Amino acid sequence: MNVRYTEKKPPADVEKITCTAQQLSINPGSWITRFWSSCDGALIEDLVKIYSTDEIAERQQTYEIAEYFPGYLLIGDDSGGRLILVDRSAIERFYLLDSGCPSITDGLAFSSMDALIKEVVG
């Protein structure tokens, strides 16, 4: 899928990615660290926001991700009340769920970010 970036920040530097990954216990080879290597946050198709290295820690705290979704990382949202999470395990899975959703199993699961974006954009 070819996506259209409504807003795209320049790549994050290696030091910023490494620091953020260590702070949040993110696997250095994860999807989000690879994304930050190409752009440090973006708005895709006017809807899908992927958080920057400067935003992501605050979002984990605001939505209490460690408490409600241990083992997952909040990486973005759909600009309409749904959150985008990834599994912290080695399996690359993306989840889209309402911000008030009590369980990850109540959300939609995707094997790629492209599939998730396609669902959001319609």
Predicted regions and their residues:
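A surface-exposed partner-binding patch
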Residues: 1-85, 90, 121
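Short, compact, well-ordered microdomains
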Residues: 89-99
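Compact, glycine/acidic-enriched structural inserts
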Residues: 100-122
